[in-house]
Amino acid sequence: MATHNIVVFGGDHCGPEVVLEAIKVLKAIETNSPSAGKFNLQNHLLGGASIDKHNDPLTDEALNAAKAADAVLLGAIGGPEWGTSSTVRPEQGLLKLRKELGTYGNLRPCNFASESLVDSSPLKAEVCRGTDFIVVRELTGGIYFGDRTEDDGSGYACDTEPYSRAEIVRIARLAGFLALAKNPPAKVWSLDKANVLATSRLWRKTVTDVISKEFPQLQLEHQLIDSAAMLLVKNPRALNGVVITSNLFGDIISDEASVIPGSIGLLPSASLGGIPDGKGKCNGIYEPIHGSAPDISGKGIVNPVGTILSVAMMLRYSLNLPKEADAVEAAVKAAIDNGTKTKDLGGNATTSDMGNAVVAELEKILKA
């Protein structure tokens, strides 16, 4: 029987609350799906909690555990008490973790966990119904990692966006793999600014080469990022499939997409350091897209669904347990369809109520 080693970072404020519900889901799988194996959970501090105890947002011990693990589950980090004026900040720990694990691809799905949530979207139901795409953002290159010149009082500053062909090739391969894994295979949308930027022209050429040569059965379409941003509001279904883009553009477009399903508390994410083809280790960092929410933490009202669905992504991509991943997603849908909703969705369920409802549905599915 397989043992899956998972490092758990509860993080700060609401982070430990939502992670607790996600762990309930893993325990339910362990009990009701023996073939899935055992989950060896190792708890460590990250972010502000680690700063408070160790004056370090990510200790060597925690980092080494994460490197050795099969996957990392994270709640949320940060808070006003560790502000931007501090020399040691929670975000430094997460950036170091991503760098050391080599997680070059960030995945953010944009879909509705339940059809009943369509009316929660800021977009009209007839516009957003059926939206189902995943943004694959290049995470370790581009303008965030380029040379920069700070304003020294002269009134001039500069940021540069470097990209190499190798960096683009590996993210294009990840997008191609994810698109091909869909049934039927999904369309690939590549977003750039090739009419202006040299890096975008290299991006477009490289993505075209990779998809046409390595994934010839896939349909690829290029879209300028500004046009895609408009399309995302006007007709988000048009982008259904796999959306691949650079670090900066992905940061912006994935945040724009996150409002479509109605609550950021619903949305998961994965940051992967390889291709999840089951042929080798594919470590990843799995976390909800929301922040640590210090204003509502400790009140039992935070929505844990984004973290629970992050567990589903972990099961699918790092632990090679697709049946259990599907079961978790189906359980979330059933729980919401049956009326269990947290405050952000217009309900009155507590954080633990939501987690318990998902677990109850999951047990039914796994026992069927």
Swiss-Prot record:
InterPro entries: IsoCit/isopropylmalate_DH_CS, IsoPropMal-DH-like_dom, Isopropylmalate_DH. Its main location: cytoplasm. It catalyses: (2R,3S)-3-isopropylmalate + NAD(+) = 4-methyl-2-oxopentanoate + CO2 + NADH. Substrate binds at R98, R108, R137, D226. It is an enzyme of class 1 (oxidoreductase). It is found in: Cytoplasm. One of its GO terms (biological process) is L-leucine biosynthetic process. Binds 1 Mg(2+) or Mn(2+) ion per subunit. NAD(+) binds at residues 79-91, 291-303. PROSITE patterns: IDH_IMDH. Its cofactor is Mg(2+); Mn(2+). Mg(2+) binds at D226, D251, D255. GO terms for molecular function: 3-isopropylmalate dehydrogenase activity; magnesium ion binding; NAD binding. SUPFAM superfamilies: Isocitrate/Isopropylmalate dehydrogenase-like (SSF53659). Keywords: Amino-acid biosynthesis, Branched-chain amino acid biosynthesis, Cytoplasm, Leucine biosynthesis, Magnesium, Manganese, Metal-binding, NAD, Oxidoreductase. Its EC number is 1.1.1.85. Pathway: Amino-acid biosynthesis; L-leucine biosynthesis; L-leucine from 3-methyl-2-oxobutanoate: step 3/4. The record marks Y144, K193 as: Important for catalysis. GO terms for cellular component: cytosol. Belongs to the isocitrate and isopropylmalate dehydrogenases family. Catalyzes the oxidation of 3-carboxy-2-hydroxy-4-methylpentanoate (3-isopropylmalate) to 3-carboxy-4-methyl-2-oxopentanoate. The product decarboxylates to 4-methyl-2 oxopentanoate. Homodimer. This is 3-isopropylmalate dehydrogenase. It comes from Neurospora crassa (strain ATCC 24698 / 74-OR23-1A / CBS 708.71 / DSM 1257 / FGSC 987).
